[in-house]
């Protein structure tokens, strides 16, 4: 039987005693587990079939969430569907009439319905007029985008229960702001990052500068970025099987790095499996184009393999929500907004599975980093002649806000 950590139980209690509200939990704290356990308990108490909607910012994350819910709930009396334009082995449609038909068929059959969708497609669920019992908004800071807000405001108003989960809330002066309680409800709980570290859920990040030998310009960006990535990888000595995420400046930079330099040859020579994903070019593993589902499955497989070396290049796709197991390092080749910066840090502060198990088995205590296989998550930034210094300063400020002051980073 799965046991929630104390802070997760408090968050679950907050959800179950409020019909609407914001749940702020740092990245790596298991927000999805809180959603899934809430759904599981509601189903166990239900006297009639329930309809759940789970909203994610990206198709890849919607698919990941669906897989996690399926495994966690392990219930044959549940029908799963997707409402987005991406790939899935489940039934999918953005046609409101078909969405309504699917949900109604499940209900008539006495079974529960889960609809996984994106912020871009939530209006299709609204148009279907499906009676929604519970909606979970994942990475809910995306709600404040003007083209998302109308849809989520309607969903929040129509659903019986609405919950907004994020590590990085976004406040501003407009009606879309997450402090608009008529749409988002109140902040029903906020968990400090130190509590997650003390519980053995995450590890602290370590900001590292890499002194580049070359001055980066628009003309030589691909060449310098590629050289810096290789140099950083050659300098990794704390693990024999680095698992590295690269936050790239643009899809164009990734493509030029691969087609105009020898970086692919060097990475293969170093024993790395090379993965990259962008909205423009799709997903690739070692020059072979694959579906997003296969890409995600392989990321999970490689992350769980203690001997596997791999590197993932992305542009603004894997920064948030994606559960890439085992990442040891992140190379930040571009400046990022505060929210995306905090989310990127979150990719590398997940606990090593062996460390998590050792703590659970009582072989060591949470926070005894000297005994951890993975005592910290490295975030590396290339610098040269003041280039990169501002990024490091901003990143360190974000890290201090979250991990030293214990505050929620609000943009």
Question: What are the functions of these language-model segments?
Answer:
Residues 142-202:
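Post-DEXD/H (motif II) to motif III coupling segment of the RecA-like Helicase ATP-binding lobe
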Residues 33-37, 48-71, 249-255:
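Conserved Walker A/P-loop ATP-binding site and its immediately adjacent core
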Residues 142, 281-409:
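Conserved RecA-like P-loop NTPase helicase motor core
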Residues 60-95:
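Conserved helix-turn-beta segment of the N-terminal RecA-like "Helicase ATP-binding" lobe
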Residues 102-152, 314-316:
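Conserved RecA-like ASCE ATPase "motif II neighborhood" in helicase/translocase motors
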Residues 186-260:
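Conserved interdomain linker/interface between the two RecA-like ATPase lobes of SF2 helicase motors
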């Amino acid at each position: 039987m799965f046991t929630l950590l104390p802070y997760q139980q408090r968050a679950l209690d907050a959800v179950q005693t409020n019909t609407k509200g914001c749940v702020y939990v740092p990245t790596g704290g298991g927000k999805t587990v809180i959603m899934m356990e809430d759904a599981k308990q509601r189903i166990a108490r239900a006297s009639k079939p329930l309809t759940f909607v789970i909203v994610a910012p990206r198709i890849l994350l919607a698919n990941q969430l669906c897989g996690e819910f399926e495994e966690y709930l392990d219930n044959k009396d549940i029908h799963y569907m997707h409402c987005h334009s991406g790939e899935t082995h489940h039934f999918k449609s953005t046609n409101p009439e078909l969405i309504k038909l699917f949900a109604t068929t499940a209900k008539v059959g006495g079974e529960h319905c889960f609809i996984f969708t994106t912020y871009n497609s939530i209006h299709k669920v609204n148009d279907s007029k499906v009676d929604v019992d519970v909606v979970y908004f994942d990475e809910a800071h995306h709600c404040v985008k003007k083209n998302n807000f109308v849809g989520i405001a309607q969903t929040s108003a129509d659903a019986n229960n609405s919950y907004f989960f994020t590590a990085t809330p976004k406040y501003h002066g407009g009606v879309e702001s997450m402090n608009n309680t008529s749409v988002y409800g109140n902040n029903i709980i906020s968990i400090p990052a130190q509590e997650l570290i003390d519980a053995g859920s995450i590890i602290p990040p370590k900001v590292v500068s890499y002194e580049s030998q070359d001055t980066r310009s628009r003309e030589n960006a691909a060449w310098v970025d590629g050289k810096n990535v290789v140099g950083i990888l050659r300098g990794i000595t704390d693990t024999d099987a680095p698992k590295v995420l690269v936050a790239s400046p643009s899809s164009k930079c990734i493509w030029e790095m691969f087609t105009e330099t020898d970086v692919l040859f060097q990475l293969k020579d170093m024993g790395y499996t090379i993965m990259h994903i962008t909205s423009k070019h799709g997903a690739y593993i070692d020059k072979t184009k694959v579906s997003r589902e296969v890409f995600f499955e392989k990321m999970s497989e490689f992350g769980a393999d203690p001997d596997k070396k791999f590197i993932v290049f992305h542009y603004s796709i894997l920064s948030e929500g994606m559960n890439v197991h085992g990442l040891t390092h992140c190379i930040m080749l571009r400046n990022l907004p505060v929210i995306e910066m905090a989310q990127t840090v979150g990719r590398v502060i997940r606990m090593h599975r062996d460390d998590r198990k050792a703590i659970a088995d009582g072989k060591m205590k949470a926070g005894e980093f000297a005994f951890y296989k993975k005592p910290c998550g490295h975030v590396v930034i290339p610098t040269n002649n003041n280039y990169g210094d501002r990024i490091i300063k901003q990143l360190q400020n974000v890290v201090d806000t979250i991990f030293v002051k214990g505050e929620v980073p609000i943009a």
